[in-house]
Amino acid sequence: MTGQGQSAAGSAAWSAVFRHVRYENLVAGVSGGVLSNLALHPLDLVKIRFAVSDGLEVRPKYKGILHCLATIWKVDGLRGLYQGVTPNVWGAGLSWGLYFFFYNAIKSYKTEGRAEQLEPLEYLVSAAEAGAMTLCITNPLWVTKTRLMLQYGGVASPSQRQYKGMFDALVKIYKYEGVRGLYKGFVPGLFGTSHGALQFMAYELLKLKYNKHINRLPEAQLSTAEYISVAALSKIFAVAATYPYQVVRARLQDQHVSYGGVTDVITKTWRKEGIGGFYKGIAPNLIRVTPACCITFVVYENVSHFLYDLREKKVS
């Protein structure tokens, strides 16, 4: 097939995918992402602080989760615990909204005209594709979030509090580091789509298996408690498999240290800290992401079903 023919075939495939988009998925995903991140942002801050804790004198030393929270509260108060909340909420809301938006469109495209459910690998690939598309749009927000979270209160140099807020950070990163600065951590972020892919695959399969086990239709709506259980199990599975990339990504995005790239981060982390360095911050991360995932998925499922019901009532 010629390049022109391949391009036309690719365009036709994407057009077919976008025929399946439903804005209910976007709205429901944004709702879930925003609510969960507002509720649990301080734990995300702790996770980032621990992830980049590599022994440098420029950083405060924390003895544990509670000590970290107490130190931030003592130095900066409630505002300190919500450092970086604006890009985090924007990023999480947009990411979850786009993820559900793209994922459901891709999944609907692949199941069109099929009687049977997707295979596990098809769920995995669909979620990975949705994750890559989402990351291309949202990576600058994650860089900004990390930079804002790593402005330590009480440190000596004023330059370490160089950003006034999300938009100021976006402008300054672009001004001094260009587009490349806004896309720091993009490569490990792409590897990180495996996290979402594994989570969505596990989530879909657990829902299907559970409904089959209790003799319900495969796509039957679950109760809130059932959604929480399925979401928690799928999240724990995904975190256990993919956490090290988050440490690598956070260190690449850290303004206090300059690394030569992904390989340089991995080499230096392994040499100085061993395998434990790749799992720094996993405890506060699990404590945060498991309930955050449960909130996100419960809100998403209920809001999306509500909006779909509204659409059906309008049609009828």
From Swiss-Prot:
Superkingdom of the organism of origin: Eukaryota
Organism of this sequence: Mus musculus (Mouse)
An MF annotation (GO) of this entry: folic acid transmembrane transporter activity
PANTHER family linked to this entry: MITOCHONDRIAL NICOTINAMIDE ADENINE DINUCLEOTIDE TRANSPORTER 1-RELATED-RELATED
Gene Ontology CC entries for this record: mitochondrial inner membrane; mitochondrion
Function per UniProt: Facilitates flavin adenine dinucleotide (FAD) translocation across the mitochondrial inner membrane into the mitochondrial matrix where it acts as a redox cofactor to assist flavoenzyme activities in fundamental metabolic processes including fatty acid beta-oxidation, amino acid and choline metabolism as well as mitochondrial electron transportation. In particular, provides FAD to DLD dehydrogenase of the glycine cleavage system, part of mitochondrial one-carbon metabolic pathway involved in neural tube closure in early embryogenesis.
Membrane association type: Multi-pass membrane protein
Keywords from the UniProt entry: Membrane, Mitochondrion, Mitochondrion inner membrane, Repeat, Transmembrane, Transmembrane helix, Transport
Free-text disruption phenotype from the record: Embryonic lethal. At 11.5 dpc, the majority of mutant embryos show neural tube defects with exencephaly or craniorachischisis associated with multiple acyl-CoA dehydrogenase deficiency. Neural tube defects can be prevented by formate supplementation in early embryogenesis.
Main location: mitochondrion
Solcar repeats: 20-109, 118-209, 222-306
Family per record: Belongs to the mitochondrial carrier (TC 2.A.29) family.
Name of the featured protein: Solute carrier family 25 member 32
GO biological process, one term: mitochondrial FAD transmembrane transport
Coiled coil stretches, renumbered: none
Subcellular location: Mitochondrion inner membrane
Catalytically driven reaction(s): FAD(in) = FAD(out)
Segments passing through the bilayer: 26-46, 89-106, 123-143, 185-203, 227-243, 281-300
